[in-house]
Amino acid sequence: MKFELKGEHIALCDLLKTVGIAQTGGQGKVFVADGNVTVDGAIELRKTAKIRKGQVVACFGETIEVS
């Protein structure tokens, strides 16, 4: 799926909530902490990692292309 970034960046847990993978920001943080999220192909464990345009986030088989 594609996600159009409105600002300079978005926190990883907020992105997961915004696109509907996580029901809440807290659930998004758990997904990240459990190692279920990759950013540009690498497992990301920082819950509030700043996601910027051009990055690709994947979680539970869903891929998010940030533009």
Regions found by a protein language model. Name each.
Residues 1-6:
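N-terminal beta-hairpin/loop module of FHA
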Residues 8-50:
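A basic, amphipathic helix-loop patch mediating RNA/tRNA/ribosome contacts
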Residues 63-67:
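Short, Lys/Arg- and Gly-enriched loop/turn segments at beta-strand edges
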